[in-house]
Amino acid sequence: MREIIYWILCAFLTVAIAIVSLRYVTNFWLLSFLYSFQLHLGVLFVAASLVILAVRRQIYGFVLLFVSLLLIAHGVIMLGEFSEGGRGTDRPPLFRLMSFNIAIDNWKNSTAITDMVIASNADVVNLLEAKPLAFHLQQLFKAYPYHIGCDTGKDTCDTLVLSKRPFLNQQVVSMGSLRKNRLVISSVDFGGETVNLVSAHLSKPYFDDFQMAELEDLAKTLGSIDGPVVLSGDFNSSSIAPSIQAFLRKQGLKTIVPEPATWPIAAGSLGIAIDHIFARAPLHLTSLKHLDDNLGSNHSGLIAEFVLDRDGETSPAK
C-alpha cells in the first residue's frame, strides 16, 4: 500500500514540477502568472518531496527534492540579476517617489488615502486606479501643484501623477489594445538634472497575450528615452516572470532586492511583488519600502528614494 501511495504522490508532484518548469521551454501566457510564484511553489514542492520520502525512501523521491531545490535556487538567482546592490545608501536622496494602486472601488478610504499622500513627503506620486480620489483632487493639487491625469471627471480618472515640481514635458498614451491611457511619460528637473518618469499599468498576464503586447509598446517607449529613467506601476507580475525578466534585461532596469511583497494583502510579507519601482543608470534606488497601511486597497503601495550617480558623484536636489 505504501508503494502505491508513494508512486501516486510522485506522479502528482512530477506533473506540478513539469508545469512550473515549462517556463524554461516556452512563455505560454496562460501560465505566466504561475511563473511569478516559482519561489513559493518551489518551497511547496520541497515540502511535498519530504512527505513522499517519509512514505518511502526511494531514489525518485530524492530526485524530486533536488529538482524542487533547483527551482528555488534559480528563483533567487533570477531576482538577484536586477539588484541595485545597496548603491549610494550613505548619500542624501535626490528625490522621493510613491507608487500606489489604490483600487478603483476603494471609495470609503479615499479621504485617508488623500491625507496619506499629502503627509508622505514624496516629491512625485504615481497613483493608479485613482477614480476614488475624484472628489479630493483640489486638496491634492494644493500640496502637489503639478499633475497629469484626472482632468475630465471621475469616469476618466485612472492614472494620476502628482509632482511638487513642474513637468518639463508630459505625455499620456496607450499600451496594447486592451485598455487606454495607462502609460504616462514625463520629466522633472531635480537639482539641475532631468529625470524621466514613466508610469505603467499592465494587464493581468492571463488575459490572453495582451500583457506581452503592452510590454513591447513599453519597451519602445523606454528605448526612445535618453538619460535617467524611473519606471513605476502595477505590472501584475513579479520580476521573475519570463516576460518581465526579458523586458528588464533589455532595458537595463534595476531595483532593490528583495522587493517588498505587494500582493495579495492577506499574505503580507509572504506574498509576491507585482507592483514595482525600477531605475535605469545613472539613476539608482537607495531605498524601497512598502507603505505601512494598504488603506483598503488590494495592493500595497511603495515608496522609493533615488540618487543620481555620474562618475561617482551624487547631485542633491535644490
Across the structure, where does each feature detected by a protein language model lie?
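Short, flexible segments with low predicted structural confidence
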Residues: 5-6, 88, 133, 249
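Structural signal for the C-terminal ends of transmembrane alpha-helices
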Residues: 50-59, 222
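Short, Lys/Arg-rich, polar N-terminal cytosolic tail immediately upstream
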Residues: 1-2
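Short, aromatic-rich membrane-interface segments at the entry and exit
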Residues: 31-32, 58-65
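N-terminal signal-anchor transmembrane helix
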Residues: 54, 63-119
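Soluble catalytic domains of enzymes that build or remodel membrane lipids, polysaccharides, and related
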Residues: 97, 103-118, 124-318
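Membrane-embedded alpha-helical segments of integral membrane proteins
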Residues: 5-52
